[in-house]
């Protein structure tokens, strides 16, 4: 059994200003996406420029923050925020939805494509490999906040969390770091290093993320305000992953888009 390493959620204090680890993790995620995007844009045959990557990051930041927060409110705890509307803006305390953020990013990519004369799937295939590092840092932020822990476990790496009771739990945030952050990034980076049919990089992202998240949800404690939605095991996270898995399979289907290009 491991004990949760109590970490002050405030990383840096400068006078009246406080910089929380949770917010810094988002900053690290955006910076890593920008750096990787610049590398991809510099590859031979790329239709992207450094300036387009800079614009892309700006669009994505707005999509992630607005979509992630709105998605969490709508999907996970609408009643609470209707009763406490001032808490809607307290994103430094946590409460972001990946699926809401993804919808925000989809809208941002559509706007970016229109502005630069690129097809939506062209933008999506370029952006997909840049997302996993952000997921990695986001889950580290969840871990530092001591939130989104897993179910009780007797495994030797089970961890006692401050607000999780006296029994060890799965450190499900770290599972997601490994699967959605490290493994997903490596798979997409290698896969996109060669020319692929349009939509295949996006399809692989949707499929693998959906499968990884769906799987981890089995050991992750469901949100207390929602519990299980069906069958005594189906969570909101799993429900939201099912369309992603189906979309990924459809984009990767044999005989799909034949337009082969460098992603």
UniProtKB/Swiss-Prot annotation:
Example GO CC term: the record gives: plasma membrane
Q: Give the transmembrane region(s).
A: 10-30, 56-76, 91-111, 117-137, 171-191, 199-219, 231-251
E.C. code: 2.5.1.145
The entry's localization annotation reads: Cell inner membrane
Name the InterPro entries for this protein.
Lgt
Binding locations of a 1,2-diacyl-sn-glycero-3-phospho-(1'-sn-glycerol): 139
Q: Name one GO biological process term.
A: lipoprotein biosynthetic process
Q: Name one Pfam family in it.
A: LGT
Q: Membrane topology type, per the record?
A: Multi-pass membrane protein
Is RNA-binding among the key words of this record?
A: no
Q: Tell me the route in metabolism or biology where this protein functions.
A: Protein modification; lipoprotein biosynthesis (diacylglyceryl transfer)
Instruction: Please provide, alphabetically and separated by semicolons, the GO molecular function terms listed in this UniProt record.
Output: phosphatidylglycerol-prolipoprotein diacylglyceryl transferase activity
Protein keywords: Cell inner membrane, Cell membrane, Membrane, Transferase, Transmembrane, Transmembrane helix
**What HAMAP family does this protein map onto?**
Lgt
Family per record: Belongs to the Lgt family.
The protein's role, per its UniProt record:
Catalyzes the transfer of the diacylglyceryl group from phosphatidylglycerol to the sulfhydryl group of the N-terminal cysteine of a prolipoprotein, the first step in the formation of mature lipoproteins.
Q: What is this protein called in UniProt?
A: Phosphatidylglycerol--prolipoprotein diacylglyceryl transferase
The species is Nitratidesulfovibrio vulgaris (strain ATCC 29579 / DSM 644 / CCUG 34227 / NCIMB 8303 / VKM B-1760 / Hildenborough) (Desulfovibrio vulgaris)
